[in-house]
Amino acid sequence: MFFKLLKDAFKIKQVRSKILFTIFIILVFRIGTTITVPGVNAKSLEALSGLSFLNMLSLVSGNAMKNFSVFALGVSPYITASIVVQLLQMDLLPKFVEWGKQGEVGRRKLNQATRYISLALAFVQSIGITAGFNALSSTKLVAAPNWQTYLFIGAVLTTGSMIVVWLGEQITDKGYGNGVSMIIFAGIVASIPEMVKGIYEDYFVNVPSDRLQSSIIFVACLIVAVLLIVYFTTYVQQAEYKIPIQYTKIAQGAPSSSYLPLKVNPAGVIPVIFASSITAAPAAVLQFLSASGNDWGWVRTAQSLLATTTPTGIAMYALLIILFTFFYTFVQINPEKAAENLQKSGAYIPGVRPGKGTEQFMSKLLRRLATVGSLFLGFISIIPIIAKDLFGLSDTVALGGTSLLIIIATGIEGMKQLEGYLLKRKYTGFMNTTTK
């Protein structure tokens, strides 16, 4: 089905241009991830590869953090800024609430505010991680650790992050899929060969001959688990809950009945990306504080509580996924606006009163769908982390669930967008033919 869809898409010039443009932007991003920040010894980070928060940061940055490239921050500051702006729209700041109700004009203002906040966050974060990683690597990361060097590296990383955000926006506007998700998707896909190589070395090369058979069985089970996750994730991401709707006689030209489709997981994979970004930040700060040379007991306690290698850390990560799923579900679908749009189009849900009754019905339904979505996202993200601790797996495998979620969800979103465009074009072509 995928190859047939791609084949049909490439026959149409406009669609082909969009696909090639998306691939071009991703290639630009991948080239940027290979350019190390000047004045930095990226090899010093190899000794820190076992740190779980570094792997989490690399995941959110599209795998650009491990070699401290000019795109090392990736879209992480932008993700945090997006969360801040969306929270401010929830009756916290009147101006942001007002912008949220202004349609396209308000959306542009909110996007501009998000960029400004992400710019400030990127600069603070860039200096923080540079100083922190320099301390963790015993001052081997930065050759001349003075304020001029830190300001220069901060400027380079901030500029790189803004370029990545711009690249993501270009994909959203002129290509296929969500730009932020596509950037992270590209980084994960690019790291798959390294991931496979790591598993091969861990279970077939660096093992005694008497354990080779058990390694083969284990890897076979791992492959089966991956296939099951792929199937389960694909099924849930495509599943829909159909709300029956009917039209009044006033709605001219409308069908007598239809349905309103809602995804079983309306929030998609964004809550996992948000949770990963938020989880990595305090873990990084605590790790940097512990490397400062001060023996602070509260730092050690906080590290043990928040690390994703501990039960409390795993629980916190799961809780963040659940909270962001509920939060983003209602960001994606506003029950008040949905009820208003149905009423304006002369549609109603059988057995539900239009207006306030429809709004309450939608809110209740969305809470149920968000519950299902959060449990699904939490399960897929957490199980590999728990399996890592139980079976002594590598961090690569531990983040495999999150990586698979992002890959599959982003792939499905891109395919749906492509499929919808082809269907729309075919319908438009048919209508043009019949009217001649």
Swiss-Prot record:
Keyword Glycoprotein: no
BP GO annotations: intracellular protein transmembrane transport; protein targeting; protein transport by the Sec complex
UniProt subcellular location: Cell membrane
Disulphide-bridged cysteine pairs: none
Highest taxon, organism lineage: Bacteria
Keywords: Cell membrane, Membrane, Protein transport, Translocation, Transmembrane, Transmembrane helix, Transport
Membrane topology: Multi-pass membrane protein
Gene3D superfamilies: SecY subunit domain
GO cellular component, one term: plasma membrane
Transmembrane regions: 19-39, 68-88, 116-136, 151-171, 179-199, 216-236, 269-289, 313-333, 372-392, 395-415
Membership in a protein family: Belongs to the SecY/SEC61-alpha family.
Job of this protein: The central subunit of the protein translocation channel SecYEG. Consists of two halves formed by TMs 1-5 and 6-10. These two domains form a lateral gate at the front which open onto the bilayer between TMs 2 and 7, and are clamped together by SecE at the back. The channel is closed by both a pore ring composed of hydrophobic SecY resides and a short helix (helix 2A) on the extracellular side of the membrane which forms a plug. The plug probably moves laterally to allow the channel to open. The ring and the pore may move independently.
UniProt-listed PANTHER family: SECY/SEC61-ALPHA FAMILY MEMBER
HAMAP family tied to this protein: SecY (MF_01465)
Subunit-structure text: Component of the Sec protein translocase complex. Heterotrimer consisting of SecY, SecE and SecG subunits. The heterotrimers can form oligomers, although 1 heterotrimer is thought to be able to translocate proteins. Interacts with the ribosome. Interacts with SecDF, and other proteins may be involved. Interacts with SecA.
Name of this chain's protein: Protein translocase subunit SecY
Organism: Streptococcus gordonii (strain Challis / ATCC 35105 / BCRC 15272 / CH1 / DL1 / V288)
